[in-house]
Amino acid sequence: MKKIIWISSYPKSGNTWIRYFLSNYFFNKKKEESSFGILNKIDKFPPNKYLENIVDKKFLEKNPFNISKYWEKVQSEIVKSDNEYIFLKNHNALLTIEGNDFTNEIYSLGAIYLVRDPRDVVVSYSNFLRNLDINQTINRVTNKNLICHISKKNSLDIEILGSWKLNYISWRDGVKKIPKIIIRYEDLIYNTFETKLKIINFLSKLLYCKVDIDQLNFSISQSDFNRLKNIENIHGFHKNENNFFNSGKTKQWTQILSKEQIAIIENEFKEEMLELGYINL
């Protein structure tokens, strides 16, 4: 039985960017010029095609957290796939909801967790959502209650996020038997080759395959942020009216957030930001 490799993160932390990189590395061996269609090689969890035949929509409408009752069932079907590799994009926290584990070592081979400075997450997330201003986005990112995010385009696309902190800690500490690697968004920008090589080394050990440096370099060039932004400007991103690849920069928060807003984020996430090198004592 094959197992799942998770590409997990809090929203706006580089998940789709890495998904594009990995899609080219593992599924574009002919080294053809790629566009956003290649992202279809890596589904977002939970994939609609597995849910639509087993879900009671009224059951979910009554309580979106009931999506947790389908997590294991969907994963048990996904691992039957004929695909050589099974990667899944995910924003869910690694939690147990009403007795339902998000995942376990039976279905999961490993996980890449992408983390980004929460001050920049707030800026990027607010820009992406559009209907929330900075203060409202800070409230969402710091909210200690579990939050269900339901896609406007697909009522079955339900994610249980938690706060930025809870999401990060859940993947850092949860299900010890699942091998994990934590990757900072900032390292993808400033140490691109070394960081992406680190990811491929991690995956190569899980998948028992050799590192292909030529394929790595090709995949890095294909997933160059400016290249993806240009493609989006010309063709759009899956008909998404919001810009998905906005700026890709770090420390945008220094120009946008007020001192009060910065203080709220840093006070709420002090321990984790220290751990990740985002603030100093």
Question: How would you name each of these model-derived features?
Answer:
Residues 1-183, 247-251, 260-281:
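PAPS-dependent sulfotransferase catalytic domain
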Residues 29-52, 87, 176-255, 259, ...:
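The conserved 3'-phosphoadenosine-5'-phosphosulfate
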